Amino acid sequence: MAEFETIIGLEVHAQLNTESKIFSTSATKFGSPPNSQTNPVCLGLPGALPVLNESALEKAIMAGIAFGCDISLFTKFDRKNYFYPDLPKGYQISQFDKPICTGGGVTFTIKGEESSRYVRLTRIHMEEDAGKLIHSADPNIPQSYVDLNRAGTPLIEIVSEPDMRSSDEAYYYLNSLKSILKYIRVSDCNMEEGSLRCDANVSIRPKGSDKFGTRVEIKNLNSFKAVKAAIDYEVKWQTEMALEGKTFQQQTKLWDSVANKTVTMRTKEMSHDYRYFPDPDLPVIILQKETVESVRSKLPELPNERKNRFVEKLGLPKYDAEVLTAEREIADYFEDALKISGDAKKTSNWVKDEVLGVVNKESITISEFSVSAQRIGGLVKLIADGKISGKIAKTVFEELLISDKDAETIVTEKNLIVVRDDKEIERIVNEAIANNQDAVAKYKSGKDRALGAIVGYVMKVSKGKADPELVNQMLLDKLGSLPPKE
């Protein structure tokens, strides 16, 4: 049976989060009433001339630098000609042969693997978004409505080389790409709102061959899981066709998420079908090196760099670092808390387990979380300084969630400071030994886990306030002096 290799390239459209559109002053706010954010330029009215949004250009350059691209000092815009109801001008302003960025790539790690992988980028180019068709929900009313609010919203299209060989690679590539775009704050990457969209180009070829097979482009992929599922389905379909000796045309398909299959939409157009030519209404762009370097100076620390620093400088486990750097806001929150606590590992544990536990449960962002990083840092500092136990800290955390008080105030008001009085702890330890003879006997016979029952008794009597280290040491000393169980 013939074996085949999968070839995957991805085209990602990311809306740039500018206040206004790429060639006009209309707003770009999502969710506004239909056709309320339009003007003569994005409506394609005669005589309306486009003017490039400088902020969009800067964000495109920022993305190129983040992905290690070469920034073109000479670039221009072209008209991509086609007819569709959501494209009022009859053409889209895009970039053809002189994109703003070339080369570069995306580094990512597949879950469970140690080594990272790298996918090259072909280019990043700027273009305007099209409008949106809204189809009637009533099958008896075959009408479609055009909303041009989105028309003219600035986009960058990030085109990869066909370097991916599995749907897993595509999935983790997209996650890494999204993380970088959000880190540098050029796009909110909200797939539900359409600000991040992906098309997958998929083909197969016999293993060992260096020739590409017939390519299928898959659209309508509204989540990374959909990308993965669509690729898996398409590879299976193309493999079955090849094994049966059948051929097919290069084509565009849609992903049907209900039927979980790809459906042919049209045979694929070639670039000459769009009759690209330079847009005569827009001058060419000649960038100065100083402009590019000015943008570079604003680039924040990227996810991989931050993750490596957390591991190498702060001594965090790789998993912790990956969780904390998945989003820039989470990493910022952790570092702000660490400035107060001074203990990286304890702060990491609290942020990734307790804080993100609440964030995920309530389906909110870290920015919407009610407890500031400074207050969490204060709580962790009390633990690190030995002033409260982990059990007491959980109680304080619950109080932090419903009040504006800081951890130290809560601990003082509720008298939760750890008890370090040797005589008082010794009294409770002696009581624990006397009242837990069965656990003592098990411990003396070699069952170390029995010690937990005795410690639990001490913590219960002290209402969780006894110093755990002192309790453990005192118990070990006292139990060690008892004769072994016969």
From Swiss-Prot:
Q: Which domain of life is it from?
A: Bacteria
Recorded GO MF terms? asparaginyl-tRNA synthase (glutamine-hydrolyzing) activity; ATP binding; glutaminyl-tRNA synthase (glutamine-hydrolyzing) activity
Keyword Nucleotide-binding (UniProt): yes
Concerning InterPro entries, the annotation shows: Asn/Gln-tRNA_amidoTrfase_suB/E, Asn/Gln-tRNA_Trfase_suB/E_cat, Asn/Gln_amidotransferase, Asn/Gln_tRNA_amidoTrase-B-like, GatB, GatB_C_1, GatB_Yqey_C_2, Gln-tRNA_amidoTrfase_suB_CS
* Class of the enzyme per the UniProt entry, highest EC level: ligase
EC nos: 6.3.5.-
Q: Which UniProt keywords apply?
A: ATP-binding, Ligase, Nucleotide-binding, Protein biosynthesis
Q: Which reaction does it catalyse?
A: L-glutamyl-tRNA(Gln) + L-glutamine + ATP + H2O = L-glutaminyl-tRNA(Gln) + L-glutamate + ADP + phosphate + H(+); L-aspartyl-tRNA(Asn) + L-glutamine + ATP + H2O = L-asparaginyl-tRNA(Asn) + L-glutamate + ADP + phosphate + 2 H(+)
What PROSITE patterns does this protein map onto?
GATB
Q: Name one GO biological process term.
A: glutaminyl-tRNAGln biosynthesis via transamidation
A Pfam family recorded for this sequence: GatB_N
What is the protein's quaternary organization? Heterotrimer of A, B and C subunits.
Assigned protein family: Belongs to the GatB/GatE family. GatB subfamily.
This chain's function reads: Allows the formation of correctly charged Asn-tRNA(Asn) or Gln-tRNA(Gln) through the transamidation of misacylated Asp-tRNA(Asn) or Glu-tRNA(Gln) in organisms which lack either or both of asparaginyl-tRNA or glutaminyl-tRNA synthetases. The reaction takes place in the presence of glutamine and ATP through an activated phospho-Asp-tRNA(Asn) or phospho-Glu-tRNA(Gln).
Q: Please report the name of this protein according to its UniProt entry.
A: Aspartyl/glutamyl-tRNA(Asn/Gln) amidotransferase subunit B
State the organism named in the record.
Leptospira borgpetersenii serovar Hardjo-bovis (strain JB197)
